Amino acid sequence: MTTGKIYFATTNLKKLNEVKEFLKTDIDHMRISMTEIQGPSEKIVEHKLDQAAPFINPKDAVIVDDTSFSLEALGGFPGVYVKDFLEIGTRKIWEIVEKIGNKSATAVCSLGIAHYENGEIVKKVFSGKLKGSITEPEKDCKTEFGYIFIPDGFNGVLKNMPTDEKNRISHRGIASRSLAAYMASKGIIKTHGP
């Protein structure tokens, strides 16, 4: 496949830079207004792809993402509503979880891609999951759960891990490697990341 541009439709430039690092290729920022439905992460990603795909040309591809963070103590809440839930702050989240007693948590990243194949748009979704537990935060944060999330088998929070180690084990790293392998197999990128 002769490739055109690869776009990432997101409002979060940090996510854009992380995906660029994983895919080791140029990715342009697609600035479009998207509505976000309620539901499972994969359905949200599929809906985002439906909104972004009409903006690409036949040689282009577009990537979208969704992240969920589920607390076992809260029956899987906040899940895909993590961005809104974080507005109460990581300190308050810790206090709630500590009262209930179950500190288990799961982070999931779902990455979707839309591209043309034989004149038709093809859409695929790849997910990565990271299990861990919640700990008391060193500081209160209202934008990232990495300050309170310790991946299983590690001693420190995800946010403080060395970048190489975090990328190797993180939910976004797992999803990105699957996406990269797919993109390489379709000739969308020549090589893929770690």
Curated annotation (Swiss-Prot):
<keyword id="KW-0546">Nucleotide metabolism</keyword>
<feature type="binding site">
    <location>
        <position position="83"/>
    </location>
    <ligand>
        <name>ITP</name>
    </ligand>
</feature>
<comment type="similarity">
    <text>Belongs to the HAM1 NTPase family.</text>
</comment>
<keyword id="KW-0479">Metal-binding</keyword>
<keyword id="KW-0464">Manganese</keyword>
<dbReference type="GO" id="GO:0036222">
    <property type="term" value="F:XTP diphosphatase activity"/>
</dbReference>
<dbReference type="GO" id="GO:0005634">
    <property type="term" value="C:nucleus"/>
</dbReference>
<comment type="subunit">
    <text>Homodimer.</text>
</comment>
<feature type="binding site">
    <location>
        <position position="36"/>
    </location>
    <ligand>
        <name>Mg(2+)</name>
    </ligand>
</feature>
<dbReference type="GO" id="GO:0036220">
    <property type="term" value="F:ITP diphosphatase activity"/>
</dbReference>
<dbReference type="GO" id="GO:0009143">
    <property type="term" value="P:nucleoside triphosphate catabolic process"/>
</dbReference>
<dbReference type="InterPro" id="IPR002637">
    <property type="entry name" value="RdgB/HAM1"/>
</dbReference>
<dbReference type="GO" id="GO:0035870">
    <property type="term" value="F:dITP diphosphatase activity"/>
</dbReference>
<dbReference type="GO" id="GO:0000166">
    <property type="term" value="F:nucleotide binding"/>
</dbReference>
<feature type="binding site">
    <location>
        <begin position="10"/>
        <end position="15"/>
    </location>
    <ligand>
        <name>ITP</name>
    </ligand>
</feature>
<feature type="binding site">
    <location>
        <begin position="171"/>
        <end position="172"/>
    </location>
    <ligand>
        <name>ITP</name>
    </ligand>
</feature>
<keyword id="KW-0547">Nucleotide-binding</keyword>
<dbReference type="GO" id="GO:0009117">
    <property type="term" value="P:nucleotide metabolic process"/>
</dbReference>
<dbReference type="Pfam" id="PF01725">
    <property type="entry name" value="Ham1p_like"/>
</dbReference>
<keyword id="KW-0378">Hydrolase</keyword>
<keyword id="KW-0460">Magnesium</keyword>
<keyword id="KW-0963">Cytoplasm</keyword>
<keyword id="KW-0539">Nucleus</keyword>
<feature type="binding site">
    <location>
        <begin position="66"/>
        <end position="67"/>
    </location>
    <ligand>
        <name>ITP</name>
    </ligand>
</feature>
<dbReference type="InterPro" id="IPR029001">
    <property type="entry name" value="ITPase-like_fam"/>
</dbReference>
<dbReference type="GO" id="GO:0046872">
    <property type="term" value="F:metal ion binding"/>
</dbReference>
<feature type="binding site">
    <location>
        <position position="48"/>
    </location>
    <ligand>
        <name>ITP</name>
    </ligand>
</feature>
<dbReference type="GO" id="GO:0005737">
    <property type="term" value="C:cytoplasm"/>
</dbReference>
<feature type="binding site">
    <location>
        <position position="166"/>
    </location>
    <ligand>
        <name>ITP</name>
    </ligand>
</feature>
<protein>
    <recommendedName>
        <fullName>Inosine triphosphate pyrophosphatase</fullName>
        <ecNumber>3.6.1.66</ecNumber>
    </recommendedName>
</protein>
<comment type="function">
    <text>Pyrophosphatase that hydrolyzes non-canonical purine nucleotides such as inosine triphosphate (ITP), deoxyinosine triphosphate (dITP) or xanthosine 5'-triphosphate (XTP) to their respective monophosphate derivatives. The enzyme does not distinguish between the deoxy- and ribose forms. Probably excludes non-canonical purines from RNA and DNA precursor pools, thus preventing their incorporation into RNA and DNA and avoiding chromosomal lesions.</text>
</comment>
